[in-house]
Amino acid sequence: MSIIVVRARSDVTVERSIRETMSHLNLTRVNHAVIIPENPQYKGMLQKAKDYITWGNADAELIEKMISERGRLIGDKPVTDADVKSSTSFGTIKDFAKAIASGDATVKDMPELKRVFRLHPPRGPKGWGGLKRTYVIGGALGPRGDDIGALVERMI
């Protein structure tokens, strides 16, 4: 399984250890997203930065859309099927996305692909929905489960 993590808040006046945790996750700016594997080390990092990020389970279609529309290679070039085929054992972006979603591959398996996806702020009348409250009580922060897809769709 893989997890999509999106940074929702700035790190101004934030404790140093939390700022470093977000840096280790490669979330250096607001509206940046990363795809990480699900393991205990990352779970601890997510829990530490829970007041500044939101995360949820990644599915193959969402990962495919993120890579094809917002994924960038070194030099700020868009990702194509030919790039995926030349640098990985997968033939298309769709196959690569399925492998990432199932946990058989990571974004690091394609060395030229930047690990951070630069997204738009959430479009629509709701926006983030409250940056000071958790998702469970109507805000934007913390774990979302499968509902992360709706947020990322509005940000792509």
Residue positions per predicted region:
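Core subunits and conserved enzymes of cellular information-processing
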Residues: M1-I156
